[in-house]
Regions:
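Bacterial Sec-dependent N-terminal signal peptides
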Residues: 1-36
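Beta-lactamase-like hydrolase cores
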Residues: 30-72, 99, 144-152
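Conserved serine DD-peptidase/penicillin-binding transpeptidase domain
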Residues: 41, 91-357, 472-476
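Residue-level signal for short segments within beta-strands and strand-turn junctions
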Residues: 56-58, 104, 440, 452
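Small-residue-rich helix-loop
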Residues: 65-67, 301, 326-478
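A generic structural motif
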Residues: 72, 126, 454-456
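Active-site-proximal alpha-helical segments within enzyme catalytic domains
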Residues: 78, 82-88, 120-123, 244-248, ...
Length: 478
């Protein structure tokens, strides 16, 4: 029989149809199996009262690998930082810097007296004097001192003035819980931030109660402690001006304990620090009230690169950094920064990428507000489209902490055994746990969102369940 006879051609075409059918059937079987894993996970008795949102997509093709209630908006906690940071890097790029401007009013006479004020304009840099910035915490103040000495200034007749007007009020979201704002993770967001807008309090057990063993920064605040040992941490903080009163219990196995509390006026702390440094340098600040004079700029002090700020933010889940970046977004279209305008920028931006704004209820940039809600599909869209960005996609992926090694996911899936690289931003608060990020293999990359509200198991048990889910789903992906 000729190779090109009608019968041979029919046989060849029939074979092709069978192979195509088997290929399609095989693919459908894999997809169904993956979806079945998700469905079985969601049917766990611990999730009977839960709200669950899951969406896993192939970044390259955009195909949805598996999903569950992907359009239901639920509380994301800190995974909402992905929306804040991805939008910022796409609008401003990783090499962008914020600037704090230093100058003075009036003139400097031949005796070295500045007849005016020293003026610092906050530029929205959350890393100024931060423990987590690339330069040491005193670098900004040291540069001011050096500039004053190079101008032969021996005294400043006026005040040290900090202009904090670039960001609109409120500094603290009205949606945040009152009990959160005393802690460093609930500190206010100002155009002029300094030393992470927080104080560090070190406590030592004396056999009956806890003594204050140290305060950083020192000699700036008064702390009164009435703390004893208990089953768990249960601490109440009251603050008035620079005086903190702390009461409650500390876990009984801890003889030393460290607390980080928010400060309401970072500008006041900075002025006190700078005045002290001026005094050491032999420069007197007289604090006289003077009239209005023209202003002369000395220098613009740059922040770390935005990309470095985002990496630090995502690995450490820093709320202050996130809130500052949210306000930075609004400056792309407005003269002053505000959270509300920043959120409006986010909504409009992602509408261009088929992210349905009806699935986003956003009230801050950090995720501290329990009113925040977002769908797994919306969050996945942000992940997917950002990873596809030719200019910043790979950079953004690397800003997320590596599961099993870094940040809040340092212990999550530590022994998962997945062949690829799993980078996840976690989010957690009372009755809320979530992960969002990427799984990357040499051949493919997948965007992953898993959010669960109101589970009835322990958080440790929930982490184990999610770990098992991701292991089953992702181990099938090469």
């Amino acid at each position: 029989m000729s190779l090109y006879s009608p019968l041979a051609i029919f046989a060849t075409n029939a074979t092709k149809r069978i192979l195509l059918f088997l290929l399609i059937f095989s693919s459908l079987t894999v997809i169904a199996t993956t979806q079945q894993i998700i469905d079985k996970f969601a049917s766990d008795p611990a999730f009977i009262p839960s709200s669950i949102g899951i969406c896993i997509t192939d970044v390259k093709t955009g195909e949805t690998i598996a999903s569950y209630n992907e359009r239901q908006a639920i509380i994301p906690a800190s995974t909402i930082k992905i929306i804040t940071t991805a939008t910022a890097l796409r609008l401003y790029r990783p090499s962008f810097c914020l600037h704090t401007t230093v100058g003075h009013t009036g003139t400097i006479d031949e005796t070295g007296t500045l007849h005016g004020d020293l003026v610092i304009h906050g530029g929205g840099d959350p890393s100024l004097g931060s423990t987590y910035r690339s330069r040491h915490t005193e670098d900004f103040i040291d540069q001011i001192i050096q500039r004053a000495l190079s101008n032969h200034i021996k005294s400043i007749e006026g005040h040290i003035v900090v202009d904090d007007s670039l960001f609109d009020e409120p500094a603290i979201s009205p949606k945040w819980m009152v009990e959160d704002i005393a802690w460093d993770y609930g500190t206010g967001c100002h155009a002029f931030s300094y030393k992470d807008n927080r104080i560090e309090i070190n406590l030592r057990y004396n056999g009956k109660s806890y003594d204050v063993a140290g305060i950083n920064p020192p000699n700036r605040f008064v702390v009164e402690a009435s703390l004893t040992k208990g089953e768990k941490e249960n601490i109440t903080v009251q603050c008035e001006n620079n005086r903190y009163t702390i009461s409650g219990t500390i876990p009984k196995r801890k003889d030393r304990y460290r607390l980080y509390l928010s400060i309401a006026r970072p500008d006041s702390l900075f002025i006190t620090d700078l005045q002290e440094k001026f005094q050491t340098a032999g420069i007197e600040v007289r604090n006289s009230n003077l009239g209005q004079f023209p202003e002369t700029t000395w220098f613009h002090y740059p922040s770390d690169y935005l990309g470095d700020i985002v990496h630090s933010l995502n690995v450490r889940s820093d709320n202050l950094y996130a809130e500052s970046i949210l306000r930075l977004l609004s400056l792309s279209a407005h003269e002053k920064g505000s959270a509300e305008k920043g959120i409006d920028i986010i909504r409009k931006y992602w509408q261009n990428y088929e992210a349905d704004s009806l699935e986003l209820f956003m009230y801050d940039g950090s995720g501290l507000a329990r009113n925040n809600k977002v769908s797994a599909k919306y969050l996945n869209c942000v992940l997917k489209e950002t990873a596809r960005d030719a200019l910043i996609g790979e950079y953004f992926v690397q800003t997320l902490p590596l599961a099993g090694k870094e940040g809040s996911v340092a212990t999550f899936m530590k022994h998962g055994g997945l062949p690829g690289e799993l980078r996840l931003k976690s989010g957690s608060m009372s009755d809320v746990h979530a992960y969002a990020g990427y799984y990357t293999t040499p051949q493919n990359r997948y965007a992953i969102v898993v959010m669960i509200n109101n589970y009835t198991c322990t958080r440790a048990q929930l982490k184990q369940k999610i770990s098992a889910l991701l292991t089953q789903v992702l181990s099938k992906k090469e």
